[in-house]
Structure formats: structure tokens, C-alpha cells
Amino acid sequence: MIVRTLDDITDTERDVRGDGWRAKRLLVRDDGVGFSLSETTVDRGAKMHLWYKHHNEACFVIDGEAEITERDTGTVHRIGPGSVYSPEHDRHTIRVTSPLRLVCVFNPPLTGRETHDAEGSYLPATD
């Protein structure tokens, strides 16, 4: 059984930071559960261009608000506490209007140290 807390992750290699965001990777590929699970926080005012080409992602909003724009269609979605979104490999931009706290699941699971590449994606996992 895996039992872990956010405090266990803080300031370890599973506590990953980027420009305006932070992800505490509670479950990763090496845990062997078939998905990864992170608590992700994004700063107010952050604008991120994302495109998860190699992963499926689902995010549940705990706190905060943002707008997600589907870059291929221009469709804008407003999200807040209780919202879930799953981009399905869509290119999207997230604009955070109040500090955002999310629970994010990725499949295939993240290894734990990923950061976004120039296209806003994570590279595929290698064995």
C-alpha cells in the first residue's frame, strides 16, 4: 500500500516547479499504479500554452478560477472549484484569474521530473 502526504513530497525531487506553477507528484510511474497523480498550483496571472501530445490529462479544480481556450477552435471555458477538464491532446491556453489549485491525473503516468517543452508538452516516457 502506498501512503504519502503533500508534506512528504515538499522540497523533494517530486516537487517540480516551472514558470508560474508547481506540481507535487504524489504518484508517479515508478509507483506502478498505471497513472500519476499530482497536486498542482498555478499563480494568479499565469498564462500557459499547453499541448499534451503524449499523455491524457484530467484536472479537478479544488480552488481558484481560470479560463481555458481551445487554440484550434477559440472556444473559451471558465473553470472554478468543482470543475473538471480533460484536454484530450488539444492545444490549449490557460489564463489564471485567481490562484489555482488542482488535482491532476496523467496517463501514461509521469516519471515525476517532467517540465513543459517549447510546445507545452511533456516528452513521452522512455524505459
Regions found by a protein language model. Give the residues of each.
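Conserved short histidine dyad/triad with adjacent acidic residue
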Residues: 21, 36-53
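A cytosolic small-molecule/anion-sensing beta-strand core signal
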Residues: 62-63, 80, 98
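A short, N-terminal "cap"/entry segment at the start of jelly-roll beta-barrel domains
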Residues: 1-34, 115-127
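Short, conserved beta-strand element in jelly-roll/cupin
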Residues: 41-42, 53-68
